[in-house]
Amino acid sequence: MRYTSAAIETLIEEFAKLPGIGRKTAQRLAMHILHEPKSGAERLAGALIDIKEKVIRCSVCQNVTDRDADPCYICSSTGRDRSVICVVESPADVLAFEKTGHYKGQYHVLHGLVSPLDGIGPDDIRIHELLARLGERHEAVPVKEVVLALNPTVEGETTSLYITRLLKPFGISVTKIARGIPVGAELEFIDEATLSRAMEGRSAV
């Protein structure tokens, strides 16, 4: 069923394009916005514009950060262990590990996984930035370990194998988080206790 208002229908269609949002949920969101004060809609619109104009990728780890906070707060922190880098697929995975409160190293966000079937190769994700980072010799604390914390999927395993081969010449310890995370699961949806155990039980590859 389509609404008699073209504006409402357009908003529903835009909401329905978001991941995990079906038409019914999109309708509820649109109705909520419709009955909100105009100021609420303006704040939402402003937040949407801000995220496109003010959010960039950290020049060090490729995680998301504000344009006026680069490097990000994790890379800038003096309390993090700079000798360990945890490689993850997305910014959501960084949030998942940070919620555990267990991992105190740094991160590198790939923004994707190698997936030949989808036409995504190594050059399409942030692998070269990782290699460039490891090749920097002016770091006060050299990187001693790279932890591969990618989703337990075919794409995740393919990417892990590719990165492992590339890192061999660096002479750096390469480890993977422990098994125990369901195959095909996404790290951002795994509970904190399971992620903590996976990080604690990581093993060499």
Swiss-Prot record:
C4-type ZnF: 58-75
SMART domains for the chain: TOPRIM
Pfam families tied to this protein: RecR_C, RecR_HhH, Toprim_4
Keywords: DNA damage, DNA recombination, DNA repair, Metal-binding, Zinc, Zinc-finger
Toprim domain location: 83-182
InterPro entries, alphabetized: DNA_Rcmb_RecR, Rcmb_RecR, TOPRIM_dom, TOPRIM_RecR
Entry's Gene Ontology molecular function annotations: DNA binding; zinc ion binding
Family (UniProt): Belongs to the RecR family.
Matching PANTHER family: RECOMBINATION PROTEIN RECR (PTHR30446:SF0)
UniProt function note: May play a role in DNA repair. It seems to be involved in an RecBC-independent recombinational process of DNA repair. It may act with RecF and RecO.
Protein name, as recorded: Recombination protein RecR
Species for this entry: Chlorobium limicola (strain DSM 245 / NBRC 103803 / 6330)
Gene: recR
